[in-house]
């Protein structure tokens, strides 16, 4: 029998220490990685519940194990809430990640050797949309569209390639694209050539849920997403689909590519979907956009170039070449000042991916802390201070002290 006194602090001091240090890092550093956010205590409570003990292969009302009457309630709540949140006909909340959600759709309707078309990774796409080293690039014939001279999606190129290659599936969505995507235009060309249309909205899901970014659900056959990032839930994935595709998607996830679902994570998803349905979530997402705009403008004012010259979402790519610094070095320097970012390639980047000429920044996490435009502008100036003085230890220490003032004033968990 387990005793409730057998806490982690008592039973595994090494692991406990590492977790405490990470908690301190999250509190004391400004998080600007666009794919990261902070979940609510309620989400973490659900994930740390006894639901982690339950195996539940199958779907609500049709399980391969007994004792699933209560986890059925949990999963059905998640399904119903996410359908309401995005206006979807059907949903699967079992994917363990966004990548597995994408893989599930591929497994459902494609065969090895089929042609797919997605956004080039080098110009802002995601590795699961056809990167050569990814399963999607190994299993399928890949055609990639990219950006035009204005660093906007080249819709004319996309349409031309679609008509020429007639892919079985067209994919929209990105991991490093700051502008709005015209999902309706993608849907029209997909219909014209008889292709499936899938949208990976992982980065934009929170904004879409709040009505602050175009909703792909009315246009796409399949919409995949993560549940973290801008949606502010646990780490996981889900798939939205037309009702006609529900059976094949469910079969593709289980037993196709996964076994028993992670019921404690699905519970966390259900909590996050309920939170996203609240009016406060719309206010939060509106502030996410305001903060991203303020951050971008502050950086531009300090001589940095934003790819596409603006952001229309939570994310932006910063071209560092004018500062004569690589993304790898900028990430390390900013990290030493307690500002967390990630190096990222920019369009036509001359550097290798692990070096890169840019950094990717996002506003969701700092907005969760309570930052508004004034703080976002200050963060932009602190970033520029570091990049303007990369070899000055005094500047790093000064910026670190300014960061501490901000993080103390805006704790992650009050």
Swiss-Prot record:
Q: Which domain of life is it from?
A: Bacteria
The GO cellular component terms are: cytosol
Biological process, per Gene Ontology: glycine biosynthetic process from serine; tetrahydrofolate interconversion
Its annotated pathway?
Answer: One-carbon metabolism; tetrahydrofolate interconversion; Amino-acid biosynthesis; glycine biosynthesis; glycine from L-serine: step 1/1
Family affiliation? Belongs to the SHMT family.
**Residues bearing PTM N6-(pyridoxal phosphate)lysine:** 229
**Could you say which residues bind (6S)-5,6,7,8-tetrahydrofolate here?**
121, 125-127
Site (Plays an important role in substrate specificity) residue list? 228
Catalysed reaction(s) here are: (6R)-5,10-methylene-5,6,7,8-tetrahydrofolate + glycine + H2O = (6S)-5,6,7,8-tetrahydrofolate + L-serine
Biological role: Catalyzes the reversible interconversion of serine and glycine with tetrahydrofolate (THF) serving as the one-carbon carrier. This reaction serves as the major source of one-carbon groups required for the biosynthesis of purines, thymidylate, methionine, and other important biomolecules. Also exhibits THF-independent aldolase activity toward beta-hydroxyamino acids, producing glycine and aldehydes, via a retro-aldol mechanism.
The enzyme's main class, written as a single word, is transferase
Enzyme Commission identifier(s): 2.1.2.1
Quaternary state and interactors: Homodimer.
> Do you know which HAMAP family this protein is assigned to?
SHMT
- This protein is called Serine hydroxymethyltransferase
One GO molecular-function entry: pyridoxal phosphate binding
Which keywords has UniProt assigned to this entry? Amino-acid biosynthesis, Cytoplasm, One-carbon metabolism, Pyridoxal phosphate, Transferase
- What species is given as this protein's source? Herminiimonas arsenicoxydans
Disulfide-bonded cysteine pairs: these are: none
Localization: Cytoplasm
Predominant location category: cytoplasm
Q: Identify which cofactors the protein needs according to its UniProt entry.
A: pyridoxal 5'-phosphate
């Amino acid at each position: 029998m387990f005793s409730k006194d057998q806490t982690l602090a008592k039973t595994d001091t090494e692991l406990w220490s590492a977790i405490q240090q990470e908690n301190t890092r999250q509190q004391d550093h400004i998080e600007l990685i666009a794919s990261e956010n902070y979940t609510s205590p309620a989400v973490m409570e659900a994930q740390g519940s006894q639901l982690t003990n339950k195996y539940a292969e199958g779907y609500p009302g049709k399980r391969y194990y007994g004792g699933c009457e209560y986890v059925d309630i949990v999963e059905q709540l998640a399904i119903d809430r996410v359908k309401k949140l995005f206006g979807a006909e059907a949903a699967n909340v079992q994917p363990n990640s966004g990548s597995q959600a994408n893989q599930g759709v591929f497994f459902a309707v494609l065969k090895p050797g089929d042609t797919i078309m997605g956004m080039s990774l080098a110009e802002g796409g995601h590795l699961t949309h056809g990167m050569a080293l990814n399963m999607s690039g190994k299993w399928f014939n890949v055609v990639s569209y990219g950006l035009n001279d204005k660093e906007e999606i080249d819709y004319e190129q996309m349409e031309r390639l679609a008509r020429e290659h007639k892919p079985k599936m067209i994919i929209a969505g990105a991991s490093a694209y700051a502008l709005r995507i015209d999902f309706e235009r993608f849907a029209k060309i997909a219909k014209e050539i008889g292709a499936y249309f899938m949208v990976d909205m992982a980065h934009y899901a929170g904004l879409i849920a709040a009505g602050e970014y175009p909703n792909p659900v009315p246009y796409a056959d399949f919409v995949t997403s993560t549940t973290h990032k801008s949606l502010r839930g646990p780490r996981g994935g889900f798939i939205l689909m037309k009702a006609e595709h529900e059976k094949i998607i469910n079969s593709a996830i289980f037993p196709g590519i996964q076994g028993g679902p992670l019921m404690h994570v699905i519970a966390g998803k259900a909590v996050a979907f309920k939170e996203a349905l609240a009016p406060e979530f719309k206010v939060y997402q509106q502030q996410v956009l305001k903060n991203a705009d303020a951050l971008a403008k502050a950086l531009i004012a300090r001589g940095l170039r934003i790819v596409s010259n603006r952001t229309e979402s939570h994310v932006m790519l910063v071209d560092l070449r004018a500062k004569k610094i690589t993304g790898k070095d900028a990430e390390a320097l900013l990290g030493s000042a307690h500002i967390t970012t990630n190096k990222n390639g920019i369009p036509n980047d001359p550097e290798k991916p692990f070096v890169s000429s840019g950094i990717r920044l996002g506003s969701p996490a700092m907005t969760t802390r309570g930052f508004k435009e004034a703080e976002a502008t200050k963060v932009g100036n602190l970033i520029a201070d570091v990049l303007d003085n990369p070899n000055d230890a005094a500047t790093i220490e000064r910026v670190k002290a300014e960061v501490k003032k901000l993080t103390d004033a805006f704790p992650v968990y009050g």
